[in-house]
Amino acid sequence: MPVSIEELKALQVQKKEASKPKFISKAKRAEMAAKAKQIQKNTTSEETTLKDIRSTTDLKRSVVQETVETTKPLPSKPKPKSTSGKFSFDWSAADDTSKAYQPSYSIDSGDGQVPKRQKRDLEDAHWSDKPVESMTSRDWRIFKEDYSIVTKGGGNIPNPLRSWNECKEIPGIVRDTISRMGYKEPTPIQRAAIPIALGIRDVIGVAETGSGKTASFLIPLISYICELPKLDERSKVNGPYGLILAPTRELAMQIKDEAVKFCAPLGFKVVSVVGGYSAQEQALAVQEGAELIVATPGRLLDVIDRRLLVLNQCCYVVMDEADRMVDMGFEEQVQKVLASLPSSNAKPDSDEAENLAAVSTRRYRQTMMYTATMPVAIEKLAKKYLRRPGIVTIGSAGQAGSTVTQLVEFLNTDEKRKRRLLDIISKRQYRPPIVVFLNYKRDCEAVSDALVAAGWRTAIIHGGKQQEQREQAVQHLKRGAVDVLVATDVAGRGLDIPNVSLVVNFQMANNIESYTHRIGRTGRAGKRGTAVTFLGQEDDDVLFELKQMISRSEASPNNQELSRHPAARMKKLQQ
């Protein structure tokens, strides 16, 4: 007789009820665990074999399974060995054998995996999260890329500075001075150049303007002087221990002011030898004893020729902005000054000059040269007077800082340029101080008059001004008594005027090097700045290099009119 529909439904309900999981109560589980424990306790020592261990494990597994699964009858006796040749498992086909599997149980404690992972994590960490001892060659490569540092000069170039405290070669009293002066973190040129110089290596530093070059040579120079005997009545007549050459009076005085901050706590004396002041007074100050002299090449050579100063014990020489000294025609004077240094302490031009152990046995003269560009004349000068130098390049040689936005406009007449200049600064987008550059003294007065008529406070610097007038103009600009500085290229190099927001090249510089140094008055010390350049027909010779320079600057937009200009498409051949 066929099964009715009601019976089929009833069977389905029964199967459904039977398939529902049934959980064992806590008391029941405790009872089963007690039974298992009692069974294990009652086994004799003779039966403690591999079979007993397996049975106990199976029993524990059954407890876990019964906690999360349906209640099952106690395991049946093992099936007899099949005689049919077919393999028979010890468990039922309905059993879920993966339920009790826990991956974490498979790793034994103390297998060494955690220490290995910690070591791997340290290796994968960023260099800023590692102690300096754990830095790998890969970490140092990334570090240099982060700060746009490129070093050359053999295999003995030391790694850059990560922080001031990690450089134990700097005397403690100098590190204290660095801290008091507010130097938080080294700049890229300081990170790279200072360790090389402290290793008694000659250094060539090629860095963008406003990059912190001054401290990068003052710190190793003063650290070097700290190791020398104090000047006394007998030794001071032999001249200074250190010499710094700068192309302009303004830059020399600026370096002197910075050097005094470092030297005063150490009891060292700094004297400037520059034009615009009495040579006799300056020579007398040197003869009274000075560990460090900051000078311009022309005035220093004049004092040496008049036998008012000797450099018999000068063992540390710095040439700052060497390319500018060459551009200004001081190359011959620089060479004469260097020739007046004692030849007895010159380094050998051999591998020994790269070996710290070798050069530390004698007190050889150390030379540092800093430049923003690397023309052929500078390469020749370096080859003649520096011995196996370590070369540090920050960014690209001859390129303005990445913090300067460079803009150009084609305006052919001075009247159009004056109106545009007033239009730019009257929008108050750029806050004072502002610097306006021109090529000729006579034009400075006209531009200044136009600015004054529009209500701006101005100061003028050019070669026709007395030294005192030029210094006063710069001080007024720094104090905020003046809004706009109108200047020729005499102020284009070295002057560190804080927070210049805008540079306007009312007339384009005659060459790309001067342009680089002009716009370097803004965007200094990591701050952003803008440089606007007015162009005319007279600037065709520099348009190609100007276009190339702007195109390499990530902060500057490409100017379509400049890009399409015929003179900007091909570099003009030198006559």
Curated annotation (Swiss-Prot):
ATP-dependent RNA helicase involved in mRNA splicing. May destabilize the U1/5'-splice site duplex to permit an effective competition for the 5'-splice site by the U6 snRNA, resulting in the switch between U1 and U6 at the 5'-splice site. May also act to unwind the U4/U6 base-pairing interaction in the U4/U6/U5 snRNP, facilitating the first covalent step of splicing. The gene is PRP28. This is Pre-mRNA-splicing ATP-dependent RNA helicase PRP28. The keyword Heme does not apply. Component of the U5 snRNP complex. One of its GO terms (biological process) is mRNA splicing, via spliceosome. It is found in: Cytoplasm; Nucleus. Its EC number is 3.6.4.13. Residues 35-130, 552-575 are annotated as: Disordered. It comes from Yarrowia lipolytica (strain CLIB 122 / E 150) (Yeast). The lineage of its organism: Eukaryota, Fungi, Dikarya, Ascomycota, Saccharomycotina. Residues 403-565 form the Helicase C-terminal domain. Keywords: ATP-binding, Cytoplasm, Helicase, Hydrolase, mRNA processing, mRNA splicing, Nucleotide-binding, Nucleus. A motif (Q motif) lies at residues 163-191. Residues 552-561 have a biased composition (Polar residues).
